[in-house]
Regions:
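Alpha-helical linker/hinge and terminal dimerization helices associated
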Residues: 24, 28-35, 70, 110-132, ...
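Generic structural concept
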Residues: 18-25, 48, 52, 107, ...
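N-terminal leader segment of winged-helix/HTH proteins
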Residues: 1-43, 112
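Charged, amphipathic alpha-helical coiled-coil/dimerization segments
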Residues: 83-142
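N-terminal helix-turn-helix DNA-binding core of bacterial DNA-binding proteins
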Residues: 32-73
């Protein structure tokens, strides 16, 4: 099946593309919202541990900055941050001279969970890549990644314009 516009008047290809893209988005969203134990015997949502990972990579990040980086509303980020704090994975800190702005940091438990998460994602990505290489060439996979990267940029721009 060709998923790009070949110039003919038949829109079937574009409908197939839109259908697959919608299904991919739904399945990926379900996966992100699912709860999983990454190896610390404390199940957590994938989206929460992804936010935790961003906090560890950006010590002192604020909810506003996290919201922009993750293209999510401040309310959504605040809710996730509260869950991470309740779980003992992060802590909040105000800096002297600016009691309004709260900075976020990972705890040792948060750092351990992030290490487990990165190991899980690395293993899962390798497994998926191995399966895809059975039916796709490396060139096709690279093309998909390029298109996906550009698609993310378009969606991010649209999100930023709506915010």
């Amino acid at each position: 099946v060709q998923y790009y516009n070949t110039g003919d008047k038949d829109s079937t290809n574009l409908i197939a593309y839109a259908s697959d893209l919608s299904m991919f988005a739904m399945l990926f969203t379900d996966m992100q919202n699912g709860t999983r134990d990454y190896g610390n015997d404390r199940p957590i949502k994938s989206v929460e541990v992804a936010i935790l990972s961003t906090i560890e990579q950006n010590p002192g990040i604020t909810v506003s900055d996290l919201s922009q980086k993750q293209h999510r509303t401040k309310g959504t980020i605040s809710s996730i941050v509260s869950n991470l704090e309740k779980g003992g994975y992060i802590y909040r800190e105000k800096r002297p001279g600016n009691a309004k702005v709260v900075h976020l940091y990972t705890t040792p438990d948060g750092e351990r969970l992030n290490t487990l998460y990165i190991a899980f994602v690395t293993k899962k990505t390798a497994e998926i890549q191995s399966e895809l290489l059975k039916v796709c060439s490396i060139s096709e996979m690279n093309s998909f990644c390029k298109v996906l990267h550009e698609y993310v940029k378009l969606l991010s721009k649209a999100f930023d314009e709506e915010s």
